[in-house]
Amino acid sequence: MAPAVVGASQLRGGDSPGPARNRDHCLNRSEVYALTREAINKRKHLGDVKGVCAHLFDDSFSAQSDYIRENLATAFIVVGDNCRERKHLGQHAARFDRVFSLKRRTLYDEYHASAGRYGDTKPCRKRRFSRAAQVRDQPAQQERLGDQSVQDSPLRKEKDLVPHQGVGGVRPGQENGQARQEEQSQQ
């Protein structure tokens, strides 16, 4: 007799998939900035306008981050389209501090902090030069043949150009009344 196969949902103790069960543990940067915008709008609505126009990199932005930290325990984000599930943000205080502290770093420092956190200590790979890069560095064919003037080209000679006929016998630069007078004089 073969042993019974146990499904993954039975091992977890429920039928909910992993990402749905752990949605409170994931908070991305766009959600942090969405909460920041909502906090600014709430402060404007309450009449507290100190530093609401401050950019993230300004020193006066600390009023926004302080307001968010004060109200983080009761803040939540609605998850999904049915608006029944909520992502509570009280447990994400460290994430908010990390995102707001990025403004004091350069991109180089942020890269090394992220790489160190996730265990990647290798430097970026060096740029390799390819044949395509060498071809791009060569002068264009037009520059090499620069002694032939564009005006002397057979495509630019007036005898080769077809004159443009306007709509209804009107040539460019001619008014509609002038064309009628010329037609009557020709008849």
UniProtKB/Swiss-Prot annotation:
Superkingdom per UniProt: Viruses
Signal peptide: which range, if any? none
UniProtKB keywords:
Transcription, Transcription regulation
Q: Name one GO biological process term.
A: viral life cycle
Annotated region Disordered: the residues are: 1-24, 119-187
InterPro entries in the record = Baculo_LEF-11 (IPR009429)
Q: What does this protein do?
A: Involved in late/very late gene activation.
**Which family does this protein fall into?**
Belongs to the baculoviridae LEF-11 family.
What is this protein called in UniProt? Late expression factor 11
- In which organism is this protein found? Lymantria dispar multicapsid nuclear polyhedrosis virus
Chain's gene name: LEF-11
